[in-house]
Amino acid sequence: MTPNMLGAYGDWANQNLPDPPRLSFRQPQFQNLDSWRALARARYRECLSGPAPSAKPIALVQHQIEFDGLEIEHLQWQLPYGPPTEALLLKPAKARGKLPAVVGLHDHGGNKYFGLRKITRITKDPHPLMLQHQERYYSGLAWANELARRGYVVLVHDTFTFGSRRIRLADVPGVIRNNQVEANPEAEDEIKAYNAFAGAHEHLVAKSLTCAGLTWPGIFVNDDQRALDYLASRPEVDATRIGCAGLSGGGLRTVMLTGADERIRCSVAVGMMTTWRDYLLNKCHTHTWMCYVPGLPLELDYPEILGLNVPNPILVLNNRQDSLFTLPEMERADQILSAVYRKAGAADRYKASFYEGPHKFDAEMQKEAFAWLDRWLKG
């Protein structure tokens, strides 16, 4: 027996995963792309078990600035649940006409105190922890700013449990926070203490949501779709040319949002591609509770969620030494998506690249990602 997350039960549990799953487009009975996608997407949305969709959010402009060649709006909107959502909308200064747009999806990174600030910059003096974060994962770049400067409208918002949407210490019982309080929230020691609490709190969030008939992905997909609603409504945005992109937890959100919403015309998922088998046997200990959708692995393999948007173009960027996944299962995910796109007659609209190095979305990878978005949203 190969050591795995379930020990002697691992092989038995793995045998419960059909390959291909029931609603995989790789199944021979599925020949009509449109009818398959309607069936599979409906089942995916059912498994997500998210909140009832609400109206397009009414965004209030908190303030506007011009920074480093960009016009930036600080926005806030209220969803039917939780604290207000903070967001940034970035676009080239003095831009004219309709522009392509991207929903920029921030990562997890074991840091729930921050959300949108992980991939944006609106001051020459950002928080020191965000400088460290961007240096570690993004070659020191705020990639949402970099993309906006290329001629995009980029919307970056805090999603469920991050940044402005985080669960506040004062709102949970003292027994689960060791009576910890937030006296000076922007202090580094308090941020690190909050993130330790938030990491330990994840299993309680997942349990509680299950008791409400909800899933964690169902909630963040709803958050992200409402942001998409707002972005598509902006007068400077061409709603037929909207994409999404993100690293890690942002890559997860890219996968899930792309699978759920046909308005996403181009996607770049970075550092978040593998198979359910990899999660099951090898790597669930390296991942957040945000990943899991009960029942879905019987219907679609993890990469096939992204494939629900075929023939819209998708780019997957992997790192060979990424400790969050095993390389064989990253490669198997590539084979699965390649098969889906070939069968749909859209092989040229799918690409996966494998880079050397650990978990990251560095400058070289950003260059490929931006070129892909340019090809399909500007071409």
State what each model feature region is.
Residues 199-214, 218-227, 266-306, 311, ...:
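Mobile cap/lid helix-loop segments that gate and shape the active-site cleft of serine hydrolases
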Residues 289, 335-379:
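C-terminal catalytic histidine-bearing segment of alpha/beta-hydrolase fold enzymes
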Residues 1-71, 79, 115, 150, ...:
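N-terminal targeting or regulatory segments adjacent to alpha/beta-hydrolase or S9 domains
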Residues 309, 316-318:
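Short beta-strand/loop motif that positions the catalytic acidic residue
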Residues 82-85, 92-102, 108-111:
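Proline/glycine-enriched tight loop/beta-turn segments at coil->beta junctions
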Residues 251-262:
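Short glycine-enriched nucleophile-adjacent loop
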Residues 105-222, 232-233, 280-281:
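Cap/lid segment of the alpha/beta-hydrolase catalytic domain
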Residues 236-248:
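Alpha/beta-hydrolase fold nucleophile elbow
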